[in-house]
């Protein structure tokens, strides 16, 4: 495996940015070239989280829709694609990539509805599932 794509959706849950930086570090340490595609907000948060560019290569940050278009038109493909899923939209992107890419597909499914989301996957892919949400409670003074 020499190339990987990390596909980010809306950064509603902060854990997505941290996990992306963690994966960027590990994959790059393994000698894998990594591209990241995401919404403008997700890419901006990622860039802000790594101001000195230790993990994020600005040349390998791509608009989500443009990246999907490149995959669909077979202008680019990857050996591994990791899709972050915390909503139905993430499931749609996961299904789209499964249909247009030859990459080994891994879904990182997180959020309050993680268990329900994983049950909706009807095709072969690896899954990592964790609720990974902040538990807001009353402050005790």
Regions found by a protein language model. Name each.
Residues 17-29:
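Histidine-anchored nucleotide/phosphate-binding helix
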Residues 40-62:
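N-terminal beta-loop-helix "entrance" segment that forms/cooperates
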Residues 47, 113-126:
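Glycine-rich, charge-decorated loop segments at or immediately adjacent to ligand/cofactor-binding or catalytic sites
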Residues 76-105:
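N-terminal glycine-rich phosphate/adenylate-binding segment common to multiple enzyme folds
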Residues 139-141:
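Conserved small/polar residues in nucleotide/adenosyl-binding loops
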């Amino acid at each position: 495996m020499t190339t990987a794509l990390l596909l980010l959706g809306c950064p509603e849950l902060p854990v997505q940015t941290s996990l992306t930086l963690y994966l960027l570090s590990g994959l790059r340490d393994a000698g894998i070239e990594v591209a990241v595609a995401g919404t403008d907000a997700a890419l901006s948060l990622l860039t802000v989280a790594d101001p000195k560019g230790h993990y994020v290569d600005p040349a390998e940050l791509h608009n989500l829709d443009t990246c999907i278009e490149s995959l669909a038109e077979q202008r680019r493909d990857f050996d591994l694609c990791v899709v972050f899923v915390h909503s139905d939209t993430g499931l749609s992107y996961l299904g789209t990539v499964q249909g247009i890419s030859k990459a080994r597909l891994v879904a990182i499914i997180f959020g309050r509805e993680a268990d329900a989301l994983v049950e909706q996957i009807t095709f072969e892919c690896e899954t990592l599932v964790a609720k990974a949400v902040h538990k807001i409670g009353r402050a005790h003074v």
